[in-house]
Each structure stands twice: as C-alpha cells, then as structure tokens.
A protein has these predicted regions:
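Glycine-rich beta-to-alpha transition loops that act as phosphate-gripper elements at the mouths
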Residues: 46-48, 121-127, 194-208
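Glycine/Thr-rich beta-alpha phosphate-binding loop at enzyme active sites
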Residues: 83-93, 136-194, 234
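Glycine-rich phosphate-binding active-site loops on the catalytic face of alpha/beta enzymes
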Residues: 80, 146-152, 204, 210-237
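Active-site glycine- and acidic-residue-rich loops that bind
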Residues: 50-63, 90, 119-139
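Alpha-helix-loop-beta-strand connector modules within alpha/beta enzyme cores
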Residues: 15, 24-40, 94-114, 166-196, ...
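Active-site beta->alpha loop and helix N-cap motifs at the rims of alpha/beta catalytic domains
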Residues: 14-77, 82
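Catalytic cores of alpha/beta
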Residues: 125-138, 190, 204-221
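Single conserved hydrophobic/aromatic residue that forms the stacking wall/gate
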Residues: 1-12
Length: 258
C-alpha cells in the first residue's frame, strides 16, 4: 500500500508513505531473475529480515540471503531499518549490528570474489548514534553506508492527525526527507574524513537535490520517490545537469601552463 500525497504547502514537495513492506516473490524467485542479468549492469542486493522473523533468528535471515545471493550481485546493502509496516526496526547499537554483520564478514572471507558490504541506516537515528554507526564502519570490514531509509516521522506534514491515523504506520519518503538525508550524509562524510563511500538516498526529487547530496559527500545516489513521480526523465535531467556543471567547471579552469 503506497499512499501518494502532496503536502507542506507546496505542490512540488511530494511524498509517499510506504506501508507495503519489502514485498517481493522471495529469495529463489530473485535468484532465477538474476541468473539472466546483463553483465553491464551493476546490481546491489538490498537485504533485510522477514517481518515475522523472531529476534533470535534475525542474523540467520541476513546470512541466508547473503550466502544465496553472493554470486549474483555486485554489492550488498544490509537494510538494518527494513520494516515499513510497523514503527520498529533492527536495533542500531553496535552489539546488535555486529551480530548481523560478523557472520557476513566471516562468509565473505572464504570466498574468491569480494562483494562490498554497506549498511543502510534510518534517518530517525539521533546524531550521536549516527556517529557510532560511522565509527563502526571505521573499525570493521564494513565498506560503506547507505543513507537513508524512509522516516517514521510526520514532522512538517500539513495532513491532519486523523487522516494520518487512517493511513496507518509506514515510512515516509520524498521531499520531506530531503534535508535530513543530506544532513546525515554530510555528518557521516565529515566523521569518516571522506574515506569511505556513501550512497545518498532520500528525498532526491530533482537535479538540484542530487547535486546537494553529492556536495554533502555522497559517492553515488539512489532514486525512489522522485522516480515514481517523475519517471525515467528524471534520470536524464540529473545526468544532463551534472554533465553541464562539469563542462562549466572545465571551461572556467585555467589551461595548463597559464
């Protein structure tokens, strides 16, 4: 159930409340599709626990998907905030995260091929906890961070509480998330001194948002809500804007020897 709406007093600030969870046809159906992948495409495996998985089995959920998808994807995004349907997620404290990550590191160590492991985090984390997650990246074989997932916050929405209650729980994505997503990426980039890749995601609705995200320290970006609203033309718009900026910078730079 995706609820699309306009809000914040501006028709251009669009958002989605995602109540569908990580709905898909399952691990083995995904593998069947990935066997026919195009070699030129870079494919990431975004994996999270099943909604009904008991706490004691969460790490086993992640490891099962990691092991089975390992030969079919180019990198992994470990979604530690994967529940869109309820106001809850995998804990982001170090002990819980390492309980998930360490078996993945151990499995990867025994493989001939290296698959980068990135941790996807929530925008609802307080800043001190974002710092702890960044420090975890610096002190473990973690390869990077994906920032951020959707938010459970409804801050700033003009929709009345009664209507929001009728819509139900779910993660909010889109324009209301832009500022916080960029703030989180900037914080991670500064704390890690730009030494690790960050995939910026959240509220990227146009080329301006993408340029701001890259300026904050993102190495790559991902699109979701903006793509739903704008379609494939958004990708063309972003690429054209980045190419134009690069051309302008090149023409403004002094020629060698001058």
């Amino acid at each position: 159930d995706l609820r699309m709406s306009r809000g914040l007093g501006d028709v251009y600030k669009r958002q989605i409340i995602n109540r569908s969870g990580l709905n898909n046809k399952g691990l083995y159906k995904a593998i069947a599709q990935l066997r026919h992948r195009h070699d030129r495409l870079i494919i990431g495996g975004n994996i999270g626990k099943n909604t009904l998985t008991q706490p004691s089995q969460v790490a086993a959920d992640y490891l099962k998907m990691f092991r089975n998808l390992y030969q079919y994807v180019d990198y992994f995004s470990i979604n530690a905030c994967c529940d869109n349907c309820a106001d809850g997620s995998v804990s982001h404290n170090k002990a819980h995260l390492m309980n998930i990550l360490q078996p993945l590191f151990d499995f990867r160590r025994g493989q001939n091929q290296y698959r980068p492991i990135l941790l996807k985090i929530s925008p609802d984390l307080p800043d001190p906890l974002i710092d702890e997650v960044t420090d975890l990246m610096l002190s473990t074989p973690l390869d990077g961070i994906v920032a951020v997932n959707g938010t459970f916050s409804r801050k700033g929405l003009e929709t009345d509480e009664e209507t929001l209650d009728e819509i139900g729980s779910g993660r909010l994505s889109g324009a209301p998330l832009t500022q916080r997503a960029i703030e989180v990426v900037r914080r991670i980039h500064r704390r890690s001194h730009g030494a690790y890749p960050i995939i910026g995601v959240g509220g990227l609705m146009n080329a301006r948002d993408v340029k701001a995200m890259l300026a904050a320290g993102a190495s790559l970006v991902q699109l979701y809500t903006g793509y739903i609203y704008e379609g494939p033309s958004l990708v063309k718009e972003i690429c054209r804007a980045l190419i134009d900026d690069a051309a302008s910078e090149a023409s403004a730079s002094p020629a060698p020897g001058k």
